[in-house]
Amino acid sequence: MRKHLLWASATLALVIAACGGSTPTSQATPTSSCANAGAAHHAYVVVQHLSGATLQKCVGFAGDTINGEALMVQSGVEYQAQTFSFGKAVCQVDNEPTTYPKCFPDNKPYWSLFFETGGAWASAANGYTTVNLHDKEALGWHYVQATDPSPAPPPLATVG
């Protein structure tokens, strides 16, 4: 009798564990976290890796605009930049590439910069430090092959 009770208790525990399962570690749909979410305006950072994986971060701000460099810093997206005679250039975003002996290595992938306004991407004419974003606009980074003469922008920001 005791063996049957132990077996029944173990079976019941397994059924309860299976039905009541733990919280999933990842979600089916990506979410966008927002720093300073209560602010009146929001701008976004959208990152697309060479693998196609994407990341989006949101930053709330009070003024009419937010500078691209302030957006990157406040978003919490990891990035590394180097200063050149023309200004700052981004060499690494969200830990890609894992190492970079040169910011612009010959025949290697690089970060292409885009600016989203009005629901459409445009290539950035200047560096990220000169971009000023308004409410619901985005800064986009796409890690692309050096052989790509006209890189595609990352996915549009999901405005929340």
Q: What are the roles of these predicted feature ranges?
A:
Residues 14-18:
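C-terminal motif of bacterial Sec signal peptides marking the signal peptidase cleavage site
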